[in-house]
Amino acid sequence: MAAGGPCPAAAGGGPGGASCSVGAPGGVSMFRWLEVLEKEFDKAFVDVDLLLGEIDPDQADITYEGRQKMTSLSSCFAQLCHKAQSVSQINHKLEAQLVDLKSELTETQAEKVVLEKEVHDQLLQLHSIQLQLHAKTGQSVDSGTIKAKLSGPSVEELERELEANKKEKMKEAQLEAEVKLLRKEDEALRGHIAVLQAEVYGARLAAKYLDKELAGRVQQIQLLGRDMKGPAHDKLWNQLEAEIHLHRHKTVIRACRGRNDLKRPMQAPPGHDQDSLKKSQGVGPIRKVLLLKEDHEGLGISITGGKEHGVPILISEIHPGQPADRCGGLHVGDAILAVDGVNLRDTKHKEAVTVLSQQRGEIEFEVVYVAPEVDSDDENVEYEDESGHRYRLYLDELEGGGNPGASCKDPSGEIKVLQGFNKKAVTDTHENGDLGTASETPLDDGASKLDDLHTLYHKKSY
C-alpha cells in the first residue's frame, strides 16, 4: 500500500501524484517556498483565464491574444523556476565547497606547524650525531652544551622513525592515487551531466512547443464552437475534457510501468487483446477482483493519482509475494473504481490511502484497465539507478555527437477531439447501477458514453 502527498502543479508540470509507502510520509521539500509561489501563480493564472473567458464572443481576438500572452508568461515562469532551482543547488554546492576548503586550510596549517617542528628536531638530531662522530674521531669541538641538551637517538628509535616516515609516504601515495581516480570520475560525470542537460533542454523545448500548440488548438476549438449553444456545446467540452484526462491517465500509467523491471514484461489482463483495446481507445471493461489479505500483511500495492491530480486512483506498483501479486487479478495501471463497495472515483489520494489501509480479509476490488499508448520514446527507457529510478535518455546519440534537439510530434496526431459528437467509448462509469460481473463482461452501450468517461476522469477543479 502506498500513499503520498500531492505534487503541486507548477507551470508546465505533470499531473501525476508521487507514490510512496503508507505510514512513511514524504520528506519536506528543499524548495517549499518555490512550491508556494507555484501554487499562487497557478491560482492567478486560472483566475485570469476565467476572466478572459467572460469576454464577449464578438471580441474573441482579444481573448485569443490574451491567452497567447498567458502561455508565454507561463513558459517564462517555468523557466524562471528551473533557473531558481539551479541557482539554489549551485549555491548549496559552493557553500559545501567553502566549508571543505576551510577545513582543508586548517588541516594544512596544522600540518605545516608539525612539519616545522619535525624539521627542527631533525636538525638537532643531525647536529648531535655530528658531534658524536667528531668525538669518536678525536676532533675537539666545543659542544658540551649541545651534548648536555641532546642525547643521541638509539638505533631502535631511528628504525621506528624510518618506519613511521614510510607509512606517511604510503598514505601520501595512496591519496595521490585516489585524487587521480576522483579526477577521472569527475571528468566522466561532467560529461554525463552535459548529456543530461542537453536532453533536459531538448525536452523543455518540446514541452514548450506542445504547450503553445495545445493552447492554439484549444483556441481554435473555442472559435469554431462559439456559436454552439445548449447540449451540443456541453457535449463538445465533455468530450474534450474526457480525451484530455484519458491521455493524462495513459501518461501516468506509462510512467508507472517504466519503473518495473524490463525483464518482466507487463501483461494485460486476460481478454484484453490489442485489437479490442484499440477499438475502445485503450479502455477495457470494468472487472471485479477478489483479494485475500491476512491481518499481518499489507495489500502489496503502491498507488498514485487522486482527484487533486486529475486522474483516478492508479496502481503504480505491485510488490512480489504480497496479496496483490498472489491474486493475479490486479495489474500496474489499473484504475481502482471501488473497494468493498466504497466508491473511489471522486476520492483524493490521502482519502484513498485511508480506505485501502482499513481493508481486512477478503476484499473485492472494482478496477478498469487502461492500456498506455505506445510511445517511440519508451524504447529508450533503459537506465535505472540504485534507488530504482529510471530515466528515458538518448545517451548513445548525444554522447556520440548526435543532435540533442528534441523531435516534436504534432499534438493533433495525439489528441483526436473532433471526430463527431456521437463517438462512443466502451467504458461504463456510472456510479450507480449494474457494474458488470467478474467475468469481465462489458456493459451494453448506453447513451452518452462520453459523459460516462468524463465522470470517471473527474471534472476540472482549480
UniProtKB/Swiss-Prot annotation:
The PDZ domain mediates interactions with FZD5, FZD8, ASIC3, GRID2, CFTR, CLCN3 and ADRB1. It is found in: Cytoplasm; Golgi apparatus membrane; Golgi apparatus, trans-Golgi network membrane; Synapse. GO terms for molecular function: transmembrane transporter binding. It comes from Pongo abelii (Sumatran orangutan). InterPro entries: GOPC (IPR038879), PDZ (IPR001478), PDZ_sf (IPR036034). GO terms for cellular component: dendrite; Golgi membrane; postsynaptic density; trans-Golgi network transport vesicle. Plays a role in intracellular protein trafficking and degradation. May regulate CFTR chloride currents and acid-induced ASIC3 currents by modulating cell surface expression of both channels. May also regulate the intracellular trafficking of the ADR1B receptor. May play a role in autophagy. Together with MARCHF2 mediates the ubiquitination and lysosomal degradation of CFTR. Overexpression results in CFTR intracellular retention and degradation in the lysosomes. The keyword Manganese does not apply. This is Golgi-associated PDZ and coiled-coil motif-containing protein. Keywords: Cell projection, Coiled coil, Cytoplasm, Golgi apparatus, Membrane, Protein transport, Synapse, Transport. The keyword Protein transport applies. Homooligomer. Interacts with FZD5. Interacts with FZD8. Interacts with GRID2 and BECN1. Interacts with CSPG5. Interacts with CLCN3. Interacts with STX6. Interacts with CFTR. Interacts with ASIC3. Interacts with GOLGA3. Interacts with NLGN1. Interacts with RHOQ. Interacts with MARCHF2; the interaction leads to CFTR ubiquitination and degradation. May interact with CACNG2. Interacts with CCDC62. It comes from the Eukaryota. Residues 427-449 are annotated as: Disordered. Transmembrane segments: none annotated. Residues 288-371 form the PDZ domain.
